């Protein structure tokens, strides 16, 4: 058994950092050591920022984004085309699409995908909120931007079924060859999707 080299407070910091996606135990130890060595410049301001975030962060009641205001910054942006809603699995997907800045639309965060094996059904996701938004009118297009997994496909089909009969165009993100991608390195599923979604040039 490894000997303890720090007090319980630093051990707790390491354990909590290790729970952050992308940080394993070793990375968490390095991050914790870096933080405590730069206590005034990093640890103090980080603790303060995290405390403030803990007090102020809310889930947007309209789209499901995280922000310090409700409705969120995205939903209150008057320059957005609110007749187009991009449906995403998670807030991280919303942020990724915003970085691309390709479509100045509204968003709707589902909070995951349908997964019967994991016990995740329609009531566990923000699907009813989406159906209600479309039912209110004013939405001409729904862009379903979920991952190209079995669960993502199942979720997309379920949403399409729920919106049947409503006057809304439903589209999906194109799947296929990434920009700068070489065909030899792509899997068969990606190549098949790319061939089926081919466009005229």
UniProtKB/Swiss-Prot annotation:
**What SUPFAM superfamilies does this protein's entry cite?**
Recombination protein RecR
What span is annotated as the signal peptide, if there is one?
none
Gene Ontology terms: biological process: DNA recombination; DNA repair
- Annotated Toprim domain residues: 83-178
Q: What would you give as a GO molecular function for this chain, any one?
A: DNA binding
The keyword Plastid is annotated on this UniProt entry: no
Q: What does this protein do?
A: May play a role in DNA repair. It seems to be involved in an RecBC-independent recombinational process of DNA repair. It may act with RecF and RecO.
PANTHER family from the xrefs?
Answer: RECOMBINATION PROTEIN RECR
Q: What is this protein called?
A: Recombination protein RecR
The organism is Sinorhizobium fredii (strain NBRC 101917 / NGR234)
> Source taxonomy lineage?
Bacteria, Pseudomonadati, Pseudomonadota, Alphaproteobacteria, Hyphomicrobiales
């Amino acid at each position: 058994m490894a000997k303890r080299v720090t007090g319980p407070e630093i051990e707790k910091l390491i354990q909590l950092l290790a729970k952050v996606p992308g940080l394993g135990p070793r990375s968490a130890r390095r991050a914790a050591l870096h933080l405590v060595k730069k206590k005034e410049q990093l640890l103090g301001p980080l603790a303060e920022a995290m405390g403030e975030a803990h007090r102020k962060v809310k889930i947007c009641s309209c789209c499901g984004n995280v922000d310090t205001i409700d409705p969120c910054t995205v939903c209150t942006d008057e320059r957005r085309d609110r007749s187009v809603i991009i449906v995403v699995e998670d807030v991280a997907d919303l942020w990724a699409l915003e970085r691309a800045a390709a479509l100045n639309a509204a968003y709707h965060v589902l909070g995951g995908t349908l997964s019967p094996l994991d016990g995740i059904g329609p009531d566990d996701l923000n699907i009813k909120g989406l159906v209600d938004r479309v039912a209110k009118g004013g939405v001409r297009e729904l862009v379903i931007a979920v991952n190209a997994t079995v669960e993502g496909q199942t979720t997309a089909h379920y949403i399409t079924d729920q919106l049947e009969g409503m006057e809304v165009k439903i589209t999906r993100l194109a799947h296929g060859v990434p920009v700068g991608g070489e065909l030899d390195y792509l899997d068969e599923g990606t190549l098949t999707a790319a061939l089926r979604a081919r466009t005229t040039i």
